[in-house]
From Swiss-Prot:
It comes from Conus ventricosus (Mediterranean cone). It comes from the Eukaryota. This is Omega-conotoxin-like Vn2. GO terms for cellular component: extracellular region; host cell presynaptic membrane. GO terms for molecular function: calcium channel regulator activity; toxin activity. Omega-conotoxins act at presynaptic membranes, they bind and block voltage-gated calcium channels (Cav). Has strong insecticidal properties at a dose of only 100 pmol/g of body weight (when injected into the haemocoel of the wax moth G.mellonella larvae). Provoques tremor and uncontrolled movements in insect larvae, that are typical symptoms caused by neurotoxins. On fish G.niger, intraperitoneal injection of the toxin causes full extension of the fins, change in posture, breathing difficulties (at 30 and 100 pmol/g body weight) and death (at 100 pmol/g body weight).
Length: 33
């Protein structure tokens, strides 16, 4: 599965996708309702 790179802008289609590292934007690691 694709992951979010550090510093990548978090947009709606990235919500809930895994991060490439622990330093990514928090919102990308959280599934919104």
């Amino acid at each position: 599965e694709d992951c979010i790179a550090v510093g990548q802008l978090c947009v709606f289609w990235n919500i809930g996708r895994p991060c490439c590292s622990g330093l990514c934007v928090f919102a990308c690691t959280v599934k919104l309702p």
